């Protein structure tokens, strides 16, 4: 019972951190500053309307760049 509660608590903490970071990101705009956690910054980001857009990486294009 305690393990399940701890697991749910961790998910809630991670989720709330992500929401807080989203709010911070929308406040500071684009590009994202380094103090925000790395999961919300991607290496090849495009700014559109002051929002960060991360391109979807397709397996085919990934294979072409590797070859």
Curated annotation (Swiss-Prot):
Residues making up the signal peptide according to the UniProt record: 1-25
GO CC terms in record: extracellular region
Post-translational modification: Contains 2 intrachain disulfide bonds (one per chain) and 1 interchain disulfide bond.
Tissue expression profile of the protein: Expressed by the venom gland.
Annotated localization: Secreted
Keywords per UniProt: Disulfide bond, Secreted, Signal, Toxin
Primary localization class, coarse: secreted
GO molecular function terms noted in the UniProt entry: toxin activity
Similarity comment text for this entry: Belongs to the ant myrmeciitoxin-01 family.
Complexes and interactors: Homodimer; disulfide-linked.
Protein name: U-myrmeciitoxin(01)-Mg4a
Organism the protein comes from: Myrmecia gulosa
């Amino acid at each position: 019972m305690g393990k399940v509660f701890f697991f749910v608590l961790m998910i809630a903490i991670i989720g709330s951190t992500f929401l807080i970071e989203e709010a911070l990101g929308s406040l500071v705009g684009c590009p994202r500053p380094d103090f925000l956690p790395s999961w919300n910054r991607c290496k090849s980001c495009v700014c559109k309307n002051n929002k960060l857009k991360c391109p979807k990486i397709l397996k085919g294009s990934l294979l072409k760049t590797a070859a």
